[in-house]
Amino acid sequence: MFTPLITHDPDGAALAAPVDAARRNGAAYKTRTIDDLRIRDNRLRAAIEGTGHLLFDGGMGTMLQAAGMKAGALPELLNFEEPQVITDIQRQYVEAGCDVITANTFGANAHKLDGAATVADVFAAAVACARAAGARYVAGDIGPIGALLRPLGTLSFDEAYDLFAEEVRAGVDAGVDLFIIETMTDLAETKAAVLACRENSDLPVFATMTFEEDGRTFLGTSPEVAAITLDAIGADVLGINCSQGPAELRGLAARMLTVTDKPVMVQANAGLPHVDDDGNTVFDIQAPEYAEAVAGMIEDGVSVVGGCCGTTPTHMAALRTLIDNHTPSPRHRKPSMSVTSAQTVVDLPCDGHKIAVIGERINPTGKKRLKQALRDGDLGYVVSQGISQQEQGADILDVNVGLPEIDEVKVIQQATEQLQGSTLLPLQIDSTDPAAVEAAVRRYAGKPIINSVNGKQQIMDEILPLVAHYGTNVVGLTLDEGGIPDTAEARFAIAERIVAEAARYGIGPDRILIDCLVMTASTNQRQAEQILRAMSLCKEHLGVKCALGVSNISFGLPARPLLGSVFLAAAFGAGLDAPIMNPGSKRFMDTVYSYRVLSAEDEGSTGYIERYAGWTDPYKIAANPAAAQAASTDAVPTVSATASADDDPIRHMVVSGRKGEIAAETERLLADHDAMDLINNHFIPALDEVGVLFDQGKFFLPQLMASAEAARVGFDTIKRLMPAGEIADKGKICVATVKGDIHDIGKNIVKMLLDNYGYTVFDLGRDVDPQEVLKTVQERDIKLVGLSALMTTTVVAMEETIKLLHAEVPGVKIIVGGAVLNPEYAKQIGADYYAKDAAESARIAEEVFGQ
């Protein structure tokens, strides 16, 4: 166990703390290996090594329902109230051949328990039940907290970590053999849980996420991003649970298998749920069909299996027979450097040459406006710089907020948090302060790059432990105590030393970008050749990737874009992988797109053709003075999802989530626009466009919410400036999470989006009694109700609420949503509409209210 370099105050704000010497020397901050784990026996060790199979148990909720659990009861309290029921179910799984029994602690965090019991008591009772059932291994079960993390919600990463750490300590004290983190949809929350397990115990950590029908989690994370990130931060086994049936999950698991060497696990549902004649939730895949589908995944390389919703001991017995007749085959992924956000992977394969443009514009050096924005705390401007670079073609964003007069630790946290909510691009965390670096990478949802380490021993001692502990990539600068060498050989020697030192921490060359440091040609003309030769040496002998800040070459010289673009082309020829540059430079981006064709990275030249169709030769333009003047700006055209909105500033600001700029623009337009015209012809079409982009998979929930927040700022401006009553009320909607269910993330997102569409939304909260919903509908004359449920055991309460509303208020329309629902199930329980996501809820509301 250890304490991170960053501590935090009760509100979750990061505070700098001294760097502990032992950690700086790698005593605690290092890449965790299997030899660091406390593993109960060789059978469990073989499963973690990927050389043996492991069988987890199956579903608990439907088994409890079959055993007579009352609708709305908190399953974790049954460990005290009816322990024999829990033990009997778990004993059935033991008798079916399950190796791992999952303790009944899925919702045993302090947020969900809400004072009903202590976390420690729940874990102690749950583990006792599992031991009484004869479990070989008991897994401490850690599920989602039930609240959105920032920037989408109000829960900080540190608060989430503390909740998980309390569970981990309770699990260790209760005697679990391992931890299973499951049913996660938020990559940041999953990372907090994995870190809590690693930093508060030495037990194995299994981690799984849940994916929608589109192959992404609720917040837009793909199987590849999940696997790369969970592998990087130290999960010992990773994979998928819940989601769908085994046949549907096979392809998702296969995608994970291509990007990780860690064992992959799958716990699928038994198909789709429906309600039987007795009102019970049942699933449609029986044990033989389930085992047949899982067999395909095992052949693909999945080595740890089990079941989730709807699976029973019979299903697990069929899997036992399956794995007893199979031995996992060794797997070896192709080495590559992977950098991810929560939604996007940038992959630089070691056996090829692929280009990733790192946008350099979020760096206050030489940028007066950015400096002032950082001093003023105007992070909206920082975010706008990130959005612009994404639109201009950057693949990764460098983030540097270093100014001596600001609290860099606090600001870099805030900047990275907001950038992750507004752009899809991975980030490169750029700071000379180890505390600032850790503040950002610890809370980052994905696998980032740290910029940078160099050949100075003190810097390597401070930064490489962070790279190891958080599983990041790192930029290595070829300078040391003697400065920047003049020769290629001396630069290479420093790079070689950095790679060797990194290896001591378990950091391979596939995670290292060497930057041979560009010197300006105006004062170091002969250095250009040395820089390129040094880079070639690094590529040939060290197996690393190479980065360069290419803009520096032309400093102090005229026609900087011309000289810089020629140097960039030469650098690509020498093996440059990641130019750190301004993607807003047309000449630079012309060089990038052209090289991608010549290197065959741009297959079929499709990207090049899309960008340059209708291109006009600039040398011919030069013959026309007026055209030459228009073409002289070196501005790169943007190619983005928001291009259709570029002729309307409000639409563009909403679609791109630029909330920092929209209030002033709204106020300006109100001078000669009617308020309702502005809403109906600018804001609402923009939100509709965002919904289309969301449906197309070009936007994900964080971007949807950023756009909704930008629209809210605009609406608030209109309301503030317009007389009361001038803005029409679009309609009243009531939303609630049903009786017995305490999960309200999806409901809260729906409320926010509907608010921003101009509806009056009454939020009744979670665990809402049907009578309370009815009372609100009658008293407020509500026409549309939204009901949410996450747990199979609470769908009965949802059906009860629907029947009551339809009986007492026949004209009311009801939307339902939640992880356990689908269109058929929604129809079966009497709902008028099923919404798969918040964007669909907004479209249904417009239909109901005739908009």
What is each residue range found by the language model?
Residues 1-513, 519-851:
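Domain-level signal for soluble alpha/beta catalytic cores
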